[in-house]
């Protein structure tokens, strides 16, 4: 499964909002420095979708706020 994700680093709280188009807006506490925000993003998405962190990959947008995430789910 692939999801478009818009990341908002340096937020006061962590939360995930689903948008009407199926994309996600993810608010992260971490700054976008040294991959900290990406690590926090993967951790939050793994918890939301109940998968291991290793099952989530950033396909594109590694250094951007607009990302394409791939989630491997055994269904």
Curated annotation (Swiss-Prot):
Q: What does the entry list under GO cellular component?
A: cytoplasm
Task: Extract the signal peptide range.
Answer: none
InterPro entries assigned to the protein according to its UniProt record, in alphabetical order: DUF167 (IPR003746), YggU-like_sf (IPR036591)
A Pfam entry, by short name: DUF167
Residue ranges of the region described as Disordered: 1-23
Note the NCBIfam families from the entry.
DUF167 family protein
The record ties this protein, via PANTHER family, to: UPF0235 PROTEIN C15ORF40
Q: Which family does it belong to?
A: Belongs to the UPF0235 family.
- Name-wise, this protein is UPF0235 protein Npun_R3528
Please report the organism this UniProt entry assigns to the protein: Nostoc punctiforme (strain ATCC 29133 / PCC 73102)
């Amino acid at each position: 499964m692939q999801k478009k994700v818009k990341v908002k680093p340096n937020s006061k709280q962590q939360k995930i909002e689903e948008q009407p188009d199926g994309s996600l807006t993810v608010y992260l506490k971490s700054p976008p420095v040294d991959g900290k925000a990406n690590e926090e993003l993967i951790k939050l998405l793994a918890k939301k979708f109940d998968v291991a962190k290793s099952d989530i990959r950033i396909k594109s947008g590694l250094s951007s706020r607009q990302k394409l995430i791939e989630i491997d789910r055994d269904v």
